[in-house]
Amino acid sequence: MHRTLLFLTWLISLTKAFNIKLPHTEKKDHLESNAVLACASYINTLKWSFDSSVVPGFYSTICSYSPAFDTWSLCIFNSLTDQIIPMDNTSFEESLGNVRKTCSFVDKKFSNISLEQYYSSLNNASSHALEDYGSIESLSTSIRVDRETRSRWIRAFHAHAYNLDISSVYGAYLTYYFVIVGIIAVFFHMSHYNGLNRALFASRFVNYIRGHFVLPTFLVDKHANHFKFLNVEVFTGLMPNSLEAWIIFGYTLANIIFLSISYIIDPYNLIFNSHLSQFTRLLADRSGILAFTQFPLIIIFTARNSFLEFLTGVKFNSFISFHKWIGRIMVLNATIHSLSYSLFAIINHAFKISNKQLYWKFGIASITVLCVLLVLSLGIVRKRHYEFFLYTHIILALLFFYCCWQHVKIFNGWKEWIVVSLLIWGLEKLFRIWNILQFRFPKATLINLNTSNNPHDEMFKVIIPKYNRRWHSKPGQYCFIYFLHPLVFWQCHPFTIIDEGEKCVLVIKPKSGLTRFIYNHILQSLNGKLQLRVAIEGPYGPSNLHLDKFDHLLLLSGGTGLPGPLDHAIKLSRNPDKPKSIDLIMAIKNPSFLNGYKSEILELKNSRSHVNVQVYLTQKTAVTKAANARDQLIHFDDIMTELTSFAHIGNARPNFSNVIENAIKSTPPGDSLAVVCCGPPVLVDDVRNTVSQKLLGYPERIIEYFEEYQCW
């Protein structure tokens, strides 16, 4: 935590030292700019005695032909006078900037129009402008535009400019939505410090909400476990839990509302030729801006940010879930933007012309890259080819940001959302590098633990010396580990580790890819031991679960999910006061895995009496089916003999519903119970739903659930 704050302080100081300024989208809906464009557009519709082919450009007549320019300046002045009482000429002088900008598109020399010239044209028009010009076929002198015409055109430009501004505001509101969610999360998280959680979680109403809308899985009984939509393999993914689902629903609803409200339609169709044309343009702008404003949130929720986790208590799993769904809504907004602009171009017979514009080409490139990125982010790709998913995700995201930058380059706005996103992304990468350097690059000892040569028992232990004694990991936290072998040094995997003071310990069951490569390398080494330098990035995850503030603690682990609960049991057993009781339940397929943590498990043997250890062997026949069963039995007997002296041994899968029920019943009214679970996806989903049901069955009991399962 202190390392994160130190790093953030350094970054803020660096930003101030170099006076870094971000791009900023200026407000579009100004009376001055509306008056300039409204008057220019109307005057441009009139016929003037001027050959516009001499000076090409949409506004060439009003910028190059003196009578038209005089008319323009008078129209601007009168439009401002209509709205500003009393008129002090300040707004008129400020409008000169918009005049220069408009005329600079015709010729750069017009960007130097002086204030003296501007007033001279106004005075000339005020003295000589014609009031009645309807019968004149070709104008050669300045005219006075009537008030009704001025007002109609200004309202038309106001409608367009207002939509650009309110779209940015609504986009910011979507960001504030998650700020509010974060503040609420901080409140509940901080309640553990002052004991307020006891009052909150003893409330029947609060537990009713938690049991129905916060803790359970959502719609299906799967959250950690992968879910197949319509039972189709391609649409494999992870469902949010109930709380995440409600937060995502609120965000989606807000996005739909902001897409649907506050449109001003010009009844006279002065800028666009129909109501349909108007609406498609306004919707295109609204959806595109909303898509841009979500870029920073999408990046923030991918960051391995221990600081946000520390403040809110929200897990990285939830951040990733928010990242996915915000990304999907952003893709939806971008798709609406693309389709609406295409329809707008078709309605106005400008599709071929638009296709030649650079901003249009980069818009097509952006949505194409986004669609490819979305397809390559499908759950089946992440699950089966994670490294491919990860690197293509990064490359395509950077390409997408580049295309977006080029897309809005000529529009003088909305670049700040890209810059902020890239800054967050870059600073997060710097923080991660700094984090790795803090641990340095120790030489770890990798030991093969499979003495029976049974494929079921394949595992290896990693013992990592700590060069930096100020580096500490707390129970349940995880680190990303890089094995610095020339062929795989860039790959990393997250593992829960046990910090033993001078060293860190973890046990890995090799699957495929990186862990299989390292395991095979260990097998080829002498005596099944290998020295290999590693890099550690972390620790990440909850650093303050406050389990020491609970009266009773139920630790549930399954399979390779043992390290976190075991570390909690070891550290908390040293506390002479709380918790009053600790139950550690381990469900494993066979005892061989326990040998990897033998010394840590046996530490509980000498701990104070209130640590209750229970081990359940869920596949008793796994040993006897092996070709060298006798050797395995001897190997297993080594750890099992030690365990039987202080732990309960069961030979069947435990009924976790009964285990949790008994823990609640044995907790006296008024005492608090924490249930911590880490294990296979099926287990954690089952325990999550069971705790939710028990909350409804025991609404006045203080029960909290902590899930340490991690998935990406």
Swiss-Prot record:
FAD binds at H493, P494, F495, T496, I497, I498, D499. Its EC number is 1.16.1.9. Heme 2 binds at H337, H407. One of its GO terms (cellular component) is plasma membrane. Induction: By transcription factor AFT2 upon iron deprivation. InterPro entries: FAD-bd_8 (IPR013112), FAD-bd_FR_type (IPR017927), Fe3_Rdtase_TM_dom (IPR013130), Fe_red_NAD-bd_6 (IPR013121), Ferric/Cupric_Reductase (IPR051410), FNR_nucleotide-bd (IPR039261). Its cofactor is FAD. NADP(+) binds at G538, P539, Y540, G541, C678, G679. Residues 18-167, 266-287, 350-360, 409-416 are vacuolar. Heme 1 binds at H323, H393. Residues 287-411 form the Ferric oxidoreductase domain. It is found in: Vacuole membrane. Keywords: Electron transport, FAD, Flavoprotein, Glycoprotein, Heme, Ion transport, Iron, Iron transport, Membrane, Metal-binding, NADP, Oxidoreductase, Signal, Transmembrane, Transmembrane helix, Transport, Vacuole. It catalyses: 2 a Fe(II)-siderophore + NADP(+) + H(+) = 2 a Fe(III)-siderophore + NADPH. It holds the Pfam family Ferric_reduct. PROSITE patterns: FAD_FR. One of its GO terms (biological process) is iron ion transport. It comes from the Eukaryota. The chain crosses the membrane at residues 168-188, 245-265, 288-308, 329-349, 361-381, 388-408, 417-437. Residues 412-546 form the FAD-binding FR-type domain. PANTHER family: FERRIC REDUCTASE TRANSMEMBRANE COMPONENT 3-RELATED, FERRIC/CUPRIC REDUCTASE TRANSMEMBRANE COMPONENT. Belongs to the ferric reductase (FRE) family. This is Ferric reductase transmembrane component 6. It comes from Saccharomyces cerevisiae (strain ATCC 204508 / S288c).
